């Protein structure tokens, strides 16, 4: 009995001498060096990194597509346009080098410069106008019917001598009416615009981008950028074209919507709904 106890004790001692660092209370082995002392200390409040949750988004200046240019054919031939009825673009920077040199050569021969070359600068304060920037009158409530009346009135006016505040308001009118169109109709609106102005397909991308960005404009940022970056004549050409085509261009393309609304036409009118009577008298003078 004594002999067996001694044998058991000696086997335990040999086992302990083989594994001197094993901790019998832990079944998992340590992944780091057991001799390494954990010297980490809790961080103070000043050392704790707090994530910055409120980053201010950097807003760069909006990139506006170039204005569609319908250059005066007289100007492209090297002659100054003296017609008061020409509504084409007369900006010299629209000409290529050959056309510009030809114009300069003819200009030095004594041709008098036309007044159509002079464009007045815009009031840049109106990029983001306030109510005080416009003359306040007894205007009617702004309903859809009133919007259409305003558009019909200004579509027939010559905007070349219009004051800046009214031109800025007309740009807003174009943006508001563009958003009344279905998004699927913006392509048709662009094509109608090109045909009305006699512009080539090389201008289609710029015109379509303007309509798309006006349609999705939030807070009027793109509208303000248009006012700042387009020259006065380009704005007048775009606004005039839009007001002339907007009231004749279909605003919906869904066959369900179109066929459903077609059933609401008055019985005596087989083509289009009858025109509403114009109860509001608009001033026909352009200041």
Swiss-Prot record:
GO cellular component terms given for this protein: host cell cytoplasm; viral nucleocapsid
Entry's Gene Ontology BP terms: symbiont-mediated suppression of host innate immune response
Post-translational modification remark: Phosphorylated by host. Phosphorylation negatively regulates the transcription activation. Phosphorylation and dephosphorylation take place in viral inclusion bodies and are largely influenced by the presence of NP. Dephosphorylated by host PPP2R5C; this dephosphorylation enhances viral transcription and is mediated by NP.
InterPro entries xref list: VP30_FiloV
Spans annotated as Oligomerization: 94-112
Zinc finger (C3H1-type) in chain: 72-90
Superkingdom in the source lineage: Viruses
Region spans: Interaction with the nucleoprotein: 180-197
Primary subcellular site in the record, as a coarse category: virion
Start-end of Polar residues biased regions: 24-34
GO MF annotations, alphabetized: RNA binding; zinc ion binding
Region (Disordered): 1-52, 268-287
Region feature RNA-binding, mapped onto this chain: 26-40
Self-association state and partner proteins as the record states: Homohexamer; hexamerization is essential for RNA binding. Interacts with the nucleoprotein/NP; this interaction plays both essential and inhibitory roles in viral RNA synthesis. Interacts with VP35. Interacts with host STAU1. Interacts (via C-terminus) with host RBBP6 isoform 1. Interacts with host DICER1; this interaction prevents TARBP2/TRBP binding to DICER1 and thus allows the virus to counteract host RNA silencing.
Task performed by this protein: Multifunctional protein that acts as a viral transcriptional activator. Promotes read-through of an RNA hairpin in the NP open reading frame to enhance viral transcription. Mechanistically, nonphosphorylated VP30 hexamers form a ternary complex with the viral leader RNA. Clamps the RNA template and the complex VP35-polymerase L together, thereby increasing the polymerase affinity for the RNA template to increase transcription initiation despite the presence of RNA secondary structures. Also assists stop-start transcription at gene junctions to promote transcription of downstream genes.
Protein name: Transcriptional activator VP30
Natural source organism: Reston ebolavirus (strain Philippines-96)
Native organism taxonomy: Viruses, Riboviria, Orthornavirae, Negarnaviricota, Haploviricotina
Gene: VP30
């Amino acid at each position: 009995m004594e002999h067996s106890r001694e044998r058991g004790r000696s086997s335990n001692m040999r086992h302990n001498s083989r594994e001197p660092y094993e901790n019998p209370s832990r079944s998992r082995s340590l992944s780091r060096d057991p001799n390494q002392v954990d010297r980490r200390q809790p961080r103070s409040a000043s050392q704790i990194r707090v994530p910055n949750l409120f980053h201010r988004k950097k807003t760069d200046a909006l990139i506006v597509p170039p204005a569609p240019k319908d250059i005066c054919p007289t100007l492209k031939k090297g002659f100054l346009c003296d017609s008061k009825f020409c509504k084409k673009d007369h900006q010299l920077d629209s000409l290529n080098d050959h056309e510009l040199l030809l114009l300069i050569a003819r200009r030095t021969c004594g041709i008098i410069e036309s007044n159509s070359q002079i464009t007045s600068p815009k009031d840049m304060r109106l990029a983001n106008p306030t109510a005080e920037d416009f003359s306040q009158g007894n205007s009617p409530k702004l309903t859809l019917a009133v919007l259409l009346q305003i558009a019909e009135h200004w579509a027939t006016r010559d905007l070349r001598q219009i004051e800046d505040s009214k031109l800025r308001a007309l740009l807003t009118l174009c943006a508001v009416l563009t958003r009344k169109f279905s998004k699927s109709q913006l392509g048709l609106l662009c094509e109608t615009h090109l045909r009305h102005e006699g512009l080539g397909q090389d201008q289609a991308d710029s015109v379509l981008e303007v309509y798309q960005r006006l349609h999705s404009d939030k807070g009027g940022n793109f509208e303000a950028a248009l006012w700042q970056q387009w020259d006065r004549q380009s704005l007048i050409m775009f606004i005039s074209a839009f007001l002339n085509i907007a009231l004749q261009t279909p605003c919906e393309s869904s066959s369900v919507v179109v066929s459903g609304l077609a059933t609401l036409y008055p019985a005596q009118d087989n083509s289009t709904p009858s025109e509403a009577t114009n109860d509001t008298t608009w001033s026909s003078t352009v200041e």
